[in-house]
Structures are given as C-alpha cells and as structure tokens.
C-alpha cells in the first residue's frame, strides 16, 4: 500500500476515533448502560492505538526506500491493522449500540489481525537496512 494512502487512512481513523470518543463520553452514556459504554470505549482505545500504528507504517514505508522487503512487511502490517480496526473496534461498537450478541465472535478475529499486524511490524523492523554514513 502506498505511504500517502496509509497516512490518509491513519489520519481518518484517528479523526473518527476523536469523534467516537467524544460521543462515548458525552452522548452515549445517556443512551446505553455503563458496561456497554465501557465496551464502546474499548473499541475507541484500540482504534486509536492502531490508527497511530497505521500512521507509523506509512512514515516508515516512506523512509525505507532502500529496503523493499521492509516496505512490504510494513504495508502488510498496516493492512492487518485496518482489518483489525474494522473487525475488533467495529464489532465492539455494534455490540455496544445494539446489544446483539453475534457481533461478539467477530471481535477475536480483529484481535488476531492486530497480533498478525504486530508480527509483520517486527519482521519489517528486522529487515530495515540502516544506511551508514
């Protein structure tokens, strides 16, 4: 994935995270029970962490022009983080808002995608060729 695309996606997820966090803090508490607000806030928390990771992947892809294998792994990490946000955070948002329990089993898949993304991130970091001056 291109660096500019990842930077845009990471920025968008971050901005949406701010909106959802504010909604959870100010509006959602009037609509649903406190335990479900906490579920929603967990989704926001993980969205923020991984939006930042997507931004970092975008920057590192941009900086690693001399290491295509690292770029590829950072790109794969970011894709896993994107899928993880949709599945993990998205399922928590849906569960909190609707109370529909079948959203629950989607959450662990998103968590696995986060873990896989971090594995790719570590592999990418190990592939970085440091330029010596």
Where do the language-model regions lie?
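Polytopic transmembrane helical bundles with strong interfacial aromatic enrichment
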Residues: 1-133
């Amino acid at each position: 994935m291109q660096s500019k695309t990842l930077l845009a996606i990471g920025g968008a997820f971050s901005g949406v995270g701010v909106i959802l966090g504010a909604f959870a803090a100010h509006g959602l508490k009037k609509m649903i029970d406190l335990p479900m607000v906490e579920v929603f806030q967990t989704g926001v928390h993980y969205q923020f962490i991984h939006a930042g990771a997507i931004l970092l992947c975008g920057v590192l892809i941009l900086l690693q022009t001399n290491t295509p294998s690292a770029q590829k792994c950072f790109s794969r990490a970011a894709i896993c983080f994107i899928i993880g946000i949709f599945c993990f955070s998205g399922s928590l948002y849906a569960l909190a808002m609707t109370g529909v329990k079948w959203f629950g089993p989607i959450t662990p898949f998103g968590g696995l995608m986060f873990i896989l993304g971090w594995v790719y991130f570590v592999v990418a970091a190990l592939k970085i060729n440091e330029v010596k001056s």
